């Protein structure tokens, strides 16, 4: 199961990219009879689109062993205003020797000074992430975690409860989204760092 592709990427003409938590199906837009669906997806332009396309092409080669070399798939990037904002695409895979995304979360939490707000549909953190969450909260950082009130899978709902209890005891403020199923995977820290993608906190 962990070898399936969980990425949700879209690149249009090599110029516009979409990345985040949304799957491609009507129920992920309109919800189901059981509950509405809440998600976060980003539309991006500029050099980061190349990085999203590279992630797709690596997956494509892994499956098909075909290199996409036609220049039409790599158009020149149009001039963009300098916003002073940096964007980076970080990938994770069971094939990779180092858990980059998990390590990124740990570093953000350990370097936070004011606040860290997080959303995830599934909360089964590794020991390093659990330690970083607890340490940040105990150090006075305003750590807030938003989860769905009801998970879409019974097992994950029950599995996450013991972890929730641990972080609440450490001072993390946990909020339960009531208006449907929260599928968003997002983190915001100190008005300076934001992450958005398809990685749940169940590394």
Listing of model-derived features with the role each one plays in the protein:
Residues 1-203:
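Charged, low-complexity intrinsically disordered terminal segments
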């Amino acid at each position: 199961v962990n070898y399936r592709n969980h990425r949700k990427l879209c690149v249009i003409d090599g110029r516009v990219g979409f990345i985040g938590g949304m799957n491609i199906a009507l129920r992920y837009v309109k919800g189901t009879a059981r509950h509405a669906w809440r998600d976060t997806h980003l539309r991006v332009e500029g050099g980061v689109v190349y990085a999203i396309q590279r992630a797709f092409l690596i997956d494509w080669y892994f499956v098909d062993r075909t290199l996409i070399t036609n220049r039409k798939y790599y158009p020149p990037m149009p001039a963009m205003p300098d916003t002073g904002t940096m964007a980076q695409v970080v990938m994770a895979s069971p094939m990779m020797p180092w858990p980059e995304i998990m390590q990124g979360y740990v570093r953000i939490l350990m370097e936070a000074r004011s606040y860290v707000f997080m959303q995830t549909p599934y909360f089964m953190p590794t020991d390093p992430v659990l330690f970083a969450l607890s340490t940040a909260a105990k150090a006075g950082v305003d750590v807030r975690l938003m989860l769905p009130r009801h998970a879409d899978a019974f097992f994950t709902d029950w599995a996450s409860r013991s972890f929730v209890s641990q972080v609440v005891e450490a001072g993390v403020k946990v909020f339960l989204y009531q208006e449907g199923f929260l599928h968003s995977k997002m983190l915001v820290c100190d008005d300076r760092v934001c992450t958005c993608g398809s990685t749940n906190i169940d590394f």
